[in-house]
């Protein structure tokens, strides 16, 4: 078949698929029937699904990492121990993939020594901001044949609040694959973390999704196989650490509609367990491909399995491609979280699920399905709201949340520590169990903090004078170059000022140090910051006047208490800057258009319009919660250009113009200091003196 013929055939199939989908959506069907028909069609005709829209190629500047793939990002969290309360509000059950050890079958199908790590380590970023390869941190590229690996996993899971692992169990008509880790967990008395099994009852296919015709090993369901299966897993269910609902062992099935007779299968299992000393069991299925009422198929409960069964909007077209041939699909993970956390529970037993991200590019090179913009904080909020709200009326035995997943490294669903963010996902899991989902917005003076970047030390005293003389006690954090820490420390000691001093590499001007500190302060529940820096603008002859005007507006007598109070009483106030220095982004974009485009795409924010404002000079009051779109992007220091005295066109200059966009994207408002103080000021008719408008 010629290339032209294939193209015509593909277009015809895409058109027919669109017609079928439109008709399918208007037919009145129950969710269960709709899901079953969809699965039937995709199992047989997955190649009919049109390719997603392509991203953008040939952008001006490449922002692909060039040095290394294991750099810690803003938001990296180190291991830390924090005591958990004796009673947790829910049992968290994380799905666990046992594919991290070689077996003869995988050797034959994928090559000698294959484990999931081979997929993980070969992956390349497909677009700018695509965080691949994702590499493990403290646990390394582990081999599950080593017992200490699973012991360490169990210890970490318990320290960070997880209540159980749910192991995928692979059974093919009497043949098991990847069972060794489960057997090891079952037998190791030093491991006390409970576990349960989920029978992944799909065929294995070379596509990695249980679909397609290139089958590696198939299922052969029958009544005899039902009995052989339950007899095999019974030894695990007899284990005292096997997870129970009440006193009933919990057994999951991944795709119940692949069972020819699920009602009869469930009955056979129950009867066998009653007759063989197990007693009653609790049967649940995973809502990965279908959503029947579990009672209709002889089961007791269902388990949500995000990101499956969700349709967040595609953001593929916005992406700045690294691989111009990338034909995968990029979706907005934040919309997945927003949708799932608001879903009501059903009138049957449904265990809610959460997900810390998804990216199966390692298994589908150049064609991955990627859920972008996942972040530990937003995952924490999703999990906390699920526990606090969705489970509010659940009986104690049913207060379970399933997490997809503990270690799906080749599908980007991972709680284990990674090189980029460390223990951030585990830390977020623990926080979700120990703090309210919505932090109080009331602000008082002790929660307001000054973050001052000191590069020009000859004006540091002037700025410290302004802080001290404002009349309001403020926590002071001074960032500076690593070579200037001692001199800054001597300055504050000489003045008798209480301040914290932090040294950073001279990269990213005042912006990168501020992002590091702001990220930490947000985790400490500090709500409000005043961002300052020792601005001189040595390429100008009026840099001192620029700095002086902003200090007067931001720290003038009797202003600080009033500004803090204004933020406290107006929860939508996100950023306040001096009125004379709050400018339209589009009129002062300078040489920053490409970097600004990168930031809007990287954070999933809207491009600037005529109403978008920025604080020229980068000094302002800000609610840290309003900066989350920027902080939750987890930028790397290496993305900031090395210091060469640039006066425009760097990522730091672009972020100066982007901060206001982040604030509005978070749902907050950019305003002026004067408006927060109730001061009416006549706008100046003179051109802005400290920057030129874009031509």
UniProtKB/Swiss-Prot annotation:
Lineage top rank: taxon: Bacteria
Concerning InterPro entries, the annotation shows: RgpF, WbsX
Matches recorded under CDD domains: Glyco_tran_WbsX
Q: What is this protein called?
A: Uncharacterized protein WxcX
Q: Which organism is it from?
A: Xanthomonas campestris pv. campestris (strain ATCC 33913 / DSM 3586 / NCPPB 528 / LMG 568 / P 25)
């Amino acid at each position: 078949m010629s290339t032209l013929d294939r193209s015509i055939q593909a277009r015809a199939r895409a058109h027919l698929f669109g017609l079928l989908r439109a008709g399918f959506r208007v037919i009145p069907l129950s969710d269960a029937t709709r899901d079953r028909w969809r699965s039937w069609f995709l199992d047989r005709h997955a190649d009919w699904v049109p390719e997603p829209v392509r991203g953008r190629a040939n952008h001006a500047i490449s922002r692909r990492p060039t040095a290394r793939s294991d750099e810690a990002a803003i938001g990296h969290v180190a291991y830390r121990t924090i005591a958990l309360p004796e009673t947790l509000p829910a049992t968290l059950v994380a799905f666990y993939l046992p594919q991290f050890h070689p077996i003869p079958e995988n050797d034959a199908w994928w090559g000698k020594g294959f484990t999931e790590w081979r997929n993980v380590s070969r992956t390349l970023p497909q677009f700018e901001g695509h965080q691949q390869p994702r590499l493990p941190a403290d646990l390394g590229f582990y081999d599950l044949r080593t017992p200490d690996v699973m012991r360490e996993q169990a210890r970490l899971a318990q320290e960070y609040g997880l209540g159980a692992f749910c192991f995928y169990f692979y059974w093919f008509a009497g043949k098991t694959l990847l069972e060794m880790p489960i057997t090891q967990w079952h037998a190791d008395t030093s491991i006390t973390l409970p576990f349960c099994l989920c029978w992944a009852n799909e065929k294995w296919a070379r596509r990695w999704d249980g679909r397609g015709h290139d089958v590696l090993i198939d299922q052969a369901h029958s009544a005899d196989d039902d009995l052989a299966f339950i007899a095999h897993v019974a030894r695990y269910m007899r284990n005292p650490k096997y997870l129970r609902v009440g006193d009933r062992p919990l057994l999951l099935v991944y795709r119940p509609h692949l069972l020819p007779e699920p009602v009869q299968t469930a009955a056979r299992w129950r009867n066998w367990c009653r007759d063989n000393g197990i007693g009653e069991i609790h049967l649940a299925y995973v809502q990965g491909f279908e959503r029947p009422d579990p009672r209709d198929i002889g089961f007791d409960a269902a388990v949500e399995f995000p990101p499956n069964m969700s349709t967040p909007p595609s953001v593929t077209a916005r992406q700045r491609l690294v691989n111009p041939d990338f034909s995968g699909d990029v979706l907005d993970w934040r919309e997945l979280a927003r949708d799932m956390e608001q879903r009501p529970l059903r009138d049957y037993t449904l265990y809610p699920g959460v997900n810390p991200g998804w990216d199966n590019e390692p298994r589908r090179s150049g064609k991955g399905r990627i859920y972008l913009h996942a972040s530990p904080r937003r995952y924490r909020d999703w999990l906390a709201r699920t526990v606090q709200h969705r489970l509010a009326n659940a009986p104690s035995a049913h207060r379970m949340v399933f997490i997809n997943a503990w270690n799906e490294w080749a599908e980007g669903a991972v709680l284990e520590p990674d090189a980029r963010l460390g223990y951030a996902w585990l830390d977020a899991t623990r926080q979700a169990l120990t703090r309210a989902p919505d932090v109080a917005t009331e602000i008082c003076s002790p929660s307001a903090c000054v973050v001052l970047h000191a590069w020009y030390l000859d004006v540091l005293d002037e700025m410290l004078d302004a802080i001290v003389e404002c009349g309001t006690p403020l926590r002071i954090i001074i960032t500076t170059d690593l070579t200037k820490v001692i001199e800054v420390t001597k300055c504050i000691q000489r003045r008798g000022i209480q301040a914290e001093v932090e040294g950073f590499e001279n990269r990213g001007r005042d912006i990168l140090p501020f992002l590091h500190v702001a990220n930490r302060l947000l985790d400490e529940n500090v709500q409000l910051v005043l961002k300052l820096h020792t601005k001189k603008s040595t390429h100008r002859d009026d840099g001192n006047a620029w700095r002086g005007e902003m200090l007067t507006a931001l720290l003038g007598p009797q202003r600080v208490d009033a500004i803090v109070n204004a933020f406290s009483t107006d929860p939508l106030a996100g950023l306040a800057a001096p009125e004379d220095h709050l400018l339209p982004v589009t009129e002062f974009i300078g040489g920053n258009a490409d970097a600004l485009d990168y930031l809007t795409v990287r954070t999933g924010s809207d491009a600037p319009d005529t109403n978008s404002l920025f604080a020229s000079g980068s000094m302002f009051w800000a609610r840290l919660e309003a900066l989350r779109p920027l902080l939750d992007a987890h930028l790397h220091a290496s993305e900031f250009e090395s210091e060469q005295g640039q006066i425009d066109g760097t990522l730091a200059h672009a972020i100066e113009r982007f901060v206001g966009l982040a604030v509005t994207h978070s749902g907050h408002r950019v305003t002026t200091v004067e408006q927060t103080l109730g001061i009416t000021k006549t706008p100046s008719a003179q051109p802005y003196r400290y920057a030129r408008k874009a031509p």
